[in-house]
């Protein structure tokens, strides 16, 4: 008799545990759904691309740098060993001196001045070399839509977009789409710029900066306050931003020129992740 009663009590206990799990799961699902709906952010997310063209040539040396470079070159020459060419030239000079003293065998005459001939050829090639101009035609015309300007500086791509009834200069940006990463949003910007004509190397998966702005009160709601923009750096490898008939919609600007285009609050946030051009890293 005791055994059937024990089995009955055990079955009732199992049934209560199943009911508890069911109600707990149901309440948890309802609470998660309520939390997700209540925690939905009123801010839209956007990704922005900080596309930089790194310097193509070195900066011109200052007088102090030129003096230091000359001093280091002098120290290098004084402490260095003879190169193979210099040893060969010294050997040929000794053989030539023996020839003048009638101590030189005519069978060894071949190639006496070969090292000197090489030096003469190199000297002629050096005299014919003309270095490229540091100032390009775009620099002379102040054509900021051209990528071939300020070759010793970093340049950043800015575009002019329509926001409401205003034309605003900014870094290229688009709205984030569900299912993609913020870096994926920045990569999508690059793909749409100039019809996939540019290739760039992204510097990491994390944003280098952010900026947020609120919508005008006329269109602002409790569930739609404004936009949070996350910036991603990328270095231009190949290509150029070329759009026929839209040359006034983009510029390649140096750090000092950003103030001519960007609004003060936006510029202050952008400058936080743009290093000085004389720094060790890009921009």
UniProtKB/Swiss-Prot annotation:
Tell where it localizes. Answer: Mitochondrion
List the Gene Ontology MF annotations in alphabetical order. Answer: structural constituent of ribosome
Q: Which residues carry this modification: N6-succinyllysine?
A: 217, 246
Write down the CDD domains for this protein, in alphabetical order: NUDIX_MRP_L46
One biological process term from GO is: mitochondrial translation
Q: What is its main location?
A: mitochondrion
Residues recorded as bearing N6-acetyllysine in the entry: 228
How is this protein named in the record?
A: Large ribosomal subunit protein mL46
């Amino acid at each position: 008799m005791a055994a059937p009663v024990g089995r009955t009590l055990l079955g009732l206990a199992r049934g209560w545990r199943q009911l508890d799990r069911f109600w707990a799961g149901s309440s948890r699902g309802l609470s998660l759904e309520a939390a997700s709906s209540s925690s939905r952010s009123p801010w839209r997310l956007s990704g922005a691309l900080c596309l930089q063209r790194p310097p193509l040539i070195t900066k011109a040396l200052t007088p102090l740098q030129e003096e230091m470079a000359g001093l280091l070159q002098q120290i290098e020459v004084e402490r260095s060993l003879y190169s193979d060419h210099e040893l060969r030239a010294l050997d040929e000079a000794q053989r030539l001196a023996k020839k003048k003293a009638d101590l030189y065998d005519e069978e060894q005459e071949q190639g006496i001045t070969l090292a000197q001939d090489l030096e003469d050829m190199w000297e002629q090639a050096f005299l014919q070399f003309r270095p490229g101009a540091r100032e390009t035609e775009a620099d002379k015309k102040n054509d900021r839509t051209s990528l071939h300007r300020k070759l010793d500086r970093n340049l950043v791509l800015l575009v002019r977009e329509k926001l409401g009834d205003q034309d605003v200069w900014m870094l290229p940006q688009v709205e984030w789409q569900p299912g993609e990463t913020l870096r994926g949003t920045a990569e999508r910007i690059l793909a749409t710029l100039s019809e996939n004509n540019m290739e760039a190397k992204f510097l990491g998966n994390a944003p280098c900066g952010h900026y947020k702005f609120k919508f005008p009160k006329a269109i602002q709601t409790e569930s739609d306050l404004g936009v949070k923009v996350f910036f991603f750096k990328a270095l231009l490898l190949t290509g150029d931003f070329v759009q026929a008939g839209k040359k006034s919609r983009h510029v390649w600007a140096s750090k000092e020129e950003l103030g001519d285009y960007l609004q003060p609050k936006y510029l202050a946030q952008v400058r936080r992740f743009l290093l000085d051009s004389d720094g060790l890293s890009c921009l």
